[in-house]
A protein has these predicted regions:
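Post-signal peptide N-terminal segment of mature Sec-exported envelope proteins
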Residues: 24-46
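Short beta-strand and strand-turn-strand segments in soluble, beta-rich domains
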Residues: 67-71, 78-88, 130-133, 173-182
């Protein structure tokens, strides 16, 4: 019994030390922010939280061989380069050699009719200690008329029920981001659920990924 308690104490101490150790920073050379930043004004949020706001769609690539947790922010600017609004920062997990599409919303949740571009900056980038408990598997994309459809399985590999924000990124033939729809998925421990997103007219590529997770 004493031996078992000693081992348990060692494991708890090791886990606590692991949490206390600062996360490794990602070298700037290991990240690439997309040159195409698309400005949109549309409905954001769900149900009673839905509202019209201006946002910027931009891709970030993890060029390294390890996962990265990346936070982007920025400002909206008018045709003269003057700031007309700030963008709320967003954090996403990016797999090795992977890409994620960010949707940075005006931090006052307001339409900005004068906004024609955005200046994007990296607010933070670290190497996560663990893989996320919810992941995407069996991703498929196919053409449906003048758009594409993306499907996948959302898999909870943990022993606890989770709630995950599942998103999709759709791009046009030139690689510009077009839309980033999302849905909130409650998913039980060890369960997988199908996800399906339909891209906008003119979309040629699409993919599904996981955003915020709460378990």
């Amino acid at each position: 019994m004493n031996r078992a308690l000693a081992i348990l104490g060692l494991l708890v101490t090791t886990a606590a030390c692991d949490r206390a150790r600062p996360l490794e920073q990602v070298e700037p050379s290991q990240l690439a922010i997309g040159a195409r930043v698309e400005i949109r004004t549309d409905t954001v949020g769900l149900d009673q939280h839905a509202r019209a706001a201006t946002f910027a769609l931009v891709d970030a690539d993890n060029l390294g061989d390890r996962p990265a947790t990346v936070t982007l922010g920025g400002v909206l600017v008018d045709a003269d380069g003057h700031e007309v609004g700030r963008l709320r920062a967003e954090t996403l997990w990016i797999p090795p050699r992977g890409r994620r599409t960010f949707a940075l919303v005006d931090d006052a949740d307001q339409p900005r009719p004068a906004a024609v571009a955005a200046r994007i900056d990296v607010r933070g980038a670290t190497r996560p200690r663990h893989e996320p408990p919810v992941a995407i598997e069996q991703g498929h994309v196919w053409k449906d008329g003048d758009r594409v459809v993306a499907t996948a399985m959302v898999v909870n590999s943990s022993d606890r029920p989770c709630q995950a924000v599942v998103l999709a990124g759709f791009h046009d033939r030139d690689g510009a981001p077009m839309t980033r729809p999302f849905s909130v998925f409650p998913i039980g421990a060890g369960i997988e659920r199908p996800a399906r997103f339909v891209g906008p007219s003119g979309s040629t590529t699409g993919y599904i990924f996981v955003g915020k997770i709460r378990c």
